[in-house]
Amino acid sequence: MGEWDFEQKAVVKAVEQAREQGELRLSTPGGRFQVRWDEGGSATALGQLAFFAEFLEVSGLFERWVGACPLAYTSPNAPAVVDVLGTWLLSILDGQWRYAHVTGLRGDAVAPGILGMKKILSDESLRRALSALAPNPPRRCTEAERAQRAAQLAKSTDWMDTALAESVDEALNTPWILDCDTTVKPLYGHQAGAEVSYNPQKPGRPSHVVHTYWISTMRLVLDAEVQHGKAHAAKHGLPRLCRLLMGLSSDQRPALVRGDIAFGNDGVMTEMESLAQGYLFTLRQTSGVKRLIERQWSRRDWQPVSQGFAAVEATLQLAGWSRARRVVVLRRRVRGDLIAEVKDDALKGQQTLLFAEAKDDLKLWEHTVLVTHTDHTLEAIGQLYRDRADCENGFDELKNQWGWGGYTTQDLERCHLSARAVALIYNGWSWSCRTAQ
């Protein structure tokens, strides 16, 4: 203890001497620098926050989000709602993915004042506030307590529904495309809904699944839904997708719903057709689809659809489908030298590269089969299919840079609430960047 006191006094004395000297000139590997102590100055690591806060003030997104929040405290020492949501916003905007990272913001004396806050809360206070917004009913509770928690959860859901709808409302007044996808969120604890299922990044690791509904080319999230790890099939996100479509007016409906092979099944397509909603999905390469490709391959009416692709359309009704549907087959010849990677189990997973030279008498093709409920031309469908890859960049950004891969708690309710909050802040930031440009 004595040595620690001595070290503390030495540090304090050195700092006081440096402050008395005023400006210091230091020689560093990068050149000469001047160091000056400023007792009254404040600093923030979030340099762009002031510009984003101006957008929030003009648009009123943050003010309405705080004003409609169903969080209510009874203790006189409880934090203000603006402090809770402001801390949450700053954490998301800083690129954090754990509640414990909030502690790194507490030394910021500028950011709270910009958002009209009094202070930045601790990570534990933020967790407790979110548990009050999205309560998880314990195993042992009365029916009255369970009903009260369910009512609070319904209020929070409506609150986020309204906030997300306001954040994308202007984008729905022009023709747009709704991209649907599923993101796997690996978990490293004992969380509710953590189940071992499809996980391409961490096979065998429990996970949650984030069903995402994305406004194509606008970099806006229409909604997000976190479910348990085995709910990665499209049928688990279909109810929410239908509610979103039915909640939009006819003028705001998407021109097209687009998805990968997970959505190319009869259940999803039948629901879209019942809503008179156009769609474009990819089909799995099942035996019936392969026979279709074989029948179409020798046709002479293949049409070029740019970027080396050629297309032809047909009608297909697979076993289990309720009706025949329009399909489009795309193909493109693969040119140049190819490399095939093979893992040998006998050599403990060692990789072996096989070099294949494409000759003129050997034609290699890449192909895909699309099913659609639209009357677009083949060239338009080919372009729409290629544009689908652009939304993957947005999903990757949200998961790896905006916190969709984190903010994990033991209950599923707060995980779901956090994912939607990340989507909301992301939408605001996207609008802010667009107005700045």
Predicted features and spans:
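Dynamic "connector" segments at or just before major functional cores
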Residues: 1-205, 211-250, 272-275
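Structural motif
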Residues: 74-83, 360, 409-419
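Acidic/histidine-rich, metal-coordinating catalytic segments
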Residues: 181, 254-264
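Active-site loop/helix belt of alpha/beta enzymes
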Residues: 264-274, 278
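An anionic, glycine-rich sequence signature occurring as long contiguous blocks
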Residues: 2-6, 11, 15, 19-31, ...
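Short amphipathic alpha-helical "interface-anchor" segments enriched in bulky aromatics
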Residues: 55, 102, 380-417, 421, ...
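Flexible loop/turn segments at secondary-structure boundaries
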Residues: 109-112, 185-187, 220, 230-231, ...
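A short, flexible helix-boundary coil/loop motif
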Residues: 425-437
